């Protein structure tokens, strides 16, 4: 039906007869001439109808936005004065000789001249995807997956599929369950990741595996998460953590070079402890120049419990954040930041405005200055390298609250004051995470997953002091987003059972849930390590959007619903009966 795409016509096509298929993007009726911007997935070209082709001109008068049409015509060069430098096809136009209206369009529920609500865009997603910016994002996503496949193939990785219907295993979120009709009362689980299957593939001898795979997690959603998402899943045998990072870094550098024309350079490597100490986050945005500075040792003897308490508590922390030029902040802005940190558990926000350092106490403005002598204030200013016109904010509480609150404040202030250089790319690796974290109920939970190997510890040493264990794990972070994470896996049965025991999984439960894995570990398991990238998040960064739904063709809302198909929906009673399922409605409280 077509000979060319609209958006691919150039001066080299001048004089050629072409047939185009697409949609009316815009129509301009000048009476004796009608111009339309005709659109397909590759872009837009101007088509015009003149009186010499009366039948085509008459039919063109009926055209409206989003009519699906076919046009045959001749490509012509535009006059110099009519060239549109803002269009890829702006040097040419098509003189139409024939027009076919394939399908007419009703009045559109989306308005191309105004900003539509996201609810409307998701309900009429098939129309939203016609917009050039949305089409370009999905084309970029397709390019990324193609680049990934070629890179992985070139590096000896095998694309191997793993099951979608599998067994529920604890991986940090709730599973989506699928009832079995054949096995009454039993359920499959949709995979949160192919984690165990890819480890089993290593045990099977496939030493380099990858897969671009759908994963499912029934968890509370955020703007950058979806209940179903796509991973670039990778596993290797006989490779160390630095070797895995080297190959995966090369992949990401390749993507940025091919898609953005940007050389990311070598990625710096930072430990979890350093990232938390300097930035209050295990996924720091290094485009922001501000850092947290520990000042607890300067405040242990002050008669101000807000500072002295955490300063003398081994589990406490007092950190300062110097904001260049922050002395210009108004009282209202400071109060807003004080309320902001309370979201993260902080009780408030102390500060020092540095107006003129040379004047000592008279050169600062601070509600806490009365609790601090001149010597302590000067020491704080020296340590933070404060200059005239700066603001110093303080966080004082337990270590987690200080990191969470001050880390979030750092990001917000950096954006509000334009301190974060959003023109830059700032990738890094974060390594050496704690293996376990407090579950809030007196027990421990795996910080990554229970198949991650500890770093430089035997099973006996791990059992004796699990709180000291460092995971042989690594995350890739770009501009404050965790785009991928992985680890060296446990390849020894004793170590795996020790980790299960620390997590409160008894031997009976181990056999029930992971018997197949424990059995496989008995038969010459190779050392193995891997990583998974979030394809959606990578695409989000590479296309310059901050909404992950913009890079998924048919995404869910934050309530895990599809507004277009109205999924989820009630099931047919007959189907439920065949599955031995009965829906019980809870009585509403009066």
Curated annotation (Swiss-Prot):
State its Enzyme Commission number(s). Answer: 6.1.1.12
- Which PROSITE patterns does this chain map to? AA_TRNA_LIGASE_II
Q: Where is this region: Aspartate?
A: 195-198
- Name the predominant localization: cytoplasm
Where in or outside the cell?
Cytoplasm
The broad enzyme category this protein falls into is ligase
InterPro entries the UniProt entry points to? Aa-tRNA-synt_II, aa-tRNA-synth_II, aa-tRNA-synth_II/BPL/LPL, Asp-tRNA-ligase_1, Asp-tRNA-ligase_1_N, Asp/Asn-tRNA-synth_IIb, AspRS_core, GAD-like_sf
Q: Which GO terms describe its cellular component?
A: cytoplasm
Q: Which Gene3D superfamilies match?
A: Bira Bifunctional Protein, Domain 2, GAD-like domain, Nucleic acid-binding proteins
Instruction: Kindly state which keywords UniProt assigns to this record, in alphabetical order.
Output: Aminoacyl-tRNA synthetase, ATP-binding, Cytoplasm, Ligase, Nucleotide-binding, Protein biosynthesis
One Pfam family matching this protein: tRNA_anti-codon
* Extent of the signal sequence: none
Q: Where does ATP bind?
A: 217-219, 226, 482, 534-537
What Gene Ontology terms describe what this protein does at the molecular function level?
A: aspartate-tRNA ligase activity; ATP binding; nucleic acid binding
Q: Name one GO biological process term.
A: aspartyl-tRNA aminoacylation
Annotated residues for binding of L-aspartate: 171, 217, 448, 489
List the catalysed reactions. tRNA(Asp) + L-aspartate + ATP = L-aspartyl-tRNA(Asp) + AMP + diphosphate
Task of the protein: Catalyzes the attachment of L-aspartate to tRNA(Asp) in a two-step reaction: L-aspartate is first activated by ATP to form Asp-AMP and then transferred to the acceptor end of tRNA(Asp).
Homology family: Belongs to the class-II aminoacyl-tRNA synthetase family. Type 1 subfamily.
Quaternary data: Homodimer.
Q: Which PANTHER family match?
A: ASPARTATE--TRNA LIGASE, MITOCHONDRIAL, ASPARTYL/LYSYL-TRNA SYNTHETASE
Protein name, entry field: Aspartate--tRNA ligase
Species annotation: Escherichia fergusonii (strain ATCC 35469 / DSM 13698 / CCUG 18766 / IAM 14443 / JCM 21226 / LMG 7866 / NBRC 102419 / NCTC 12128 / CDC 0568-73)
